[in-house]
Amino acid sequence: MKNNQANEKSKGFSDGERAAMKERAEELKAEAEKADGESALLAKIAQMQEPDRAMAKRLHAIIKGSAPALTPKTWYGMPAYAKDGKVVCFFQSAQKFKSRYATVGFSDEANLDEGNMWPTSYALKNLTAAEEAKIGALVKKAVSRAMRP
């Protein structure tokens, strides 16, 4: 009879074990989505012409370094970075829209608020160390929640 009781107990998982397995499944799903989004983003960057491709590659590194919690994805066919599924910042190539400059933009999810008016997009013709530093600081500020309600 003792064997039957032991077998009955071992047939199922405890609540704690089930919760841990559910958490792990969610982690694996999130990792897979992040990997898929990054693959799609890198494929879009590879399709760009120079100098947009070089700027987009560098921006990808800057954004990942400044806000590793953001998830790379594509948004309207352009590189974008999201938090909790919502786009925070993005890159628009000059060639796609036949513009004289590329654009680095931020959505309303970005915490860039400064008083009653602030910029949400920036023209980008060249990416030097000065612009890299500015963009890195903007991305860090964009993902901070200090000022957001």
Give residue ranges: language-model regions.
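Charge-dense, helix-prone N-terminal extensions
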Residues: 1-149
